[in-house]
């Protein structure tokens, strides 16, 4: 009788050990990188410091868009060979609909301190775009996002002085229309 019970338990344990774990049942670890997650918690924009200067204001940045499993979907690298001609991320924010990640940058070497090149990651097109290409040169780092996907930036020029880089004028665009 003991032998039968032992054999039965042995077969039971063997059967349990042979069962496969269904895919997707293991909880995904949160993506661990400096940055910000999208409002829908499906993507994370990682802001990594690269180059010879590890800390602001002279560091250079790499932006990686990752899914929550940690896979890199897109990368925008601002590292320069000499560490003084790249860019670093200053302000960054997701649009409320989670379709766009927007960030402003400054020169790592202090060149053109008036020009805050601003970029976006377009989730549907899986690509980065420069906002300046659609608005003109951005002269203030603090862009404003409003639902669902509007951006307002301050750009070069006034009605009386098209070369002005101190005051400029506001430009508002819908991110989903920038092609």
Q: Where are these predicted regions, by residue range?
A:
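Short, solvent-exposed loop/turn segments at conserved positions within beta-propeller repeat blades
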Residues: 54-59, 110-115, 165-168
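Short glycine-/Asp-/Thr-/Trp-enriched loop segments that recur within the blades
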Residues: 81-88, 138-141
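Positively charged n-region of N-terminal signal peptides that target proteins for export
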Residues: 1-4
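A short beta-strand motif characteristic of beta-propeller blades
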Residues: 73-83, 127-132
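Beta-propeller domains
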Residues: 58-75
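Acidic, small-residue rich beta-repeat scaffolds with periodic aromatic anchors
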Residues: 10, 14-37, 50-54, 121-179
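Residue-level detector of Asp-centered blade-edge/turn motifs that repeat once per structural unit
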Residues: 39-40, 96-97
């Amino acid at each position: 009788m003991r032998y039968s019970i032992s054999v039965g338990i042995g077969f039971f344990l063997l059967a349990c050990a042979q069962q496969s774990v269904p895919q997707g049942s293991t909880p995904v670890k949160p993506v661990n990188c400096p940055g910000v997650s999208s409002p829908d918690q499906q993507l994370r924009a990682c802001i990594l410091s690269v180059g010879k200067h590890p800390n602001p204001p002279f560091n250079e940045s790499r932006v990686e868009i990752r899914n929550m499993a940690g896979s890199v979907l897109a990368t925008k690298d601002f590292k320069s060979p000499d560490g003084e001609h790249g860019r670093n991320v200053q302000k960054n924010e997701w649009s409320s609909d989670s379709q766009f990640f927007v960030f402003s940058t400054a020169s790592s070497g202090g060149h053109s301190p008036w020009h805050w090149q601003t970029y976006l990651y377009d989730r549907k097109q899986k690509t980065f775009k420069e906002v300046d290409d659609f608005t003109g040169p951005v002269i203030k780092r603090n862009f404003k996002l409003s639902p669902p996907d509007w951006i307002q930036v301050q750009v070069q020029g006034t009605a009386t002085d098209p070369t002005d880089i101190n005051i400029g004028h506001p430009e508002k665009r819908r991110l989903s229309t920038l092609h």
